[in-house]
Amino acid sequence: RTIDGSRDDTKDTLELEVMIKGFFNKELLLDYLQYFIGFEINGSKVVKKQAGYHQFHGVRAAVENTIKATSKTGDGRCGVFWHTQGSGKSFSMVCYAAKLMATMEMENPTLVIVTDRNDLDDQLFETFMINEELLRQKPIQAEGRNDLQQKLASRPTGGIFFTTMQKFKPEKGQSRYPILSERHNIVVMADEAHRSQYG
């Protein structure tokens, strides 16, 4: 582990020093407490979920890259946040959404979470619903193509929408899907992007 989450590992630094300087820094600690702890109800128990080291630093870097990518000089490409299986991707997505929604530079963005299967859409939507308090708003699942278009077109700011890739298929006779908005702060999060995204 390193103090700032970078790959520049300093072997001469004591582990305790890394923890104190890297986690008990006022800005980092407050950030962690605000955006990286969630609570889930499991039967009759309340379970606390906390982001791990890789999630905390990964989400912070992803938010920073998103701010740059959506700025006037940005290219609109926020990047890829890759996880191995079972390493907390869904919770990282929740933390990213929570932090991004509250980031002043993003001007109350709209998030569109895209999956390539209905079961994944339902599963991820449920994870976000469980963490509604952390997100400070209720996620919405689009029912169909027209529903998604209406929701995005009528939403000037904010909102977390779930949909599947199939809803972006062009209408019969069209070669491209129509532009839904010219806003710079609509962020698309593609789950399992390696299966359906390219370019």
Residue ranges of model-derived segments:
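Conserved helicase motor
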Residues: 118, 140-150, 165-170
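A generic local structural motif
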Residues: 98-100, 146-149, 173-176
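Conserved motor-coupling elements within RecA-like helicase/translocase cores
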Residues: 143-161, 179-180
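Short beta-strand-centered segment that lines the nucleotide-binding/catalytic pocket of NTP-utilizing
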Residues: 113-115
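Acidic/polar loop patches that form or flank catalytic/metal-binding clefts of enzymes
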Residues: 135-141, 195-196
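Conserved RecA-like ASCE ATPase "motif II neighborhood" in helicase/translocase motors
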Residues: 158-192, 196-199
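ATP-dependent helicase/translocase motor core
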Residues: 1-110, 119, 123-134, 156, ...
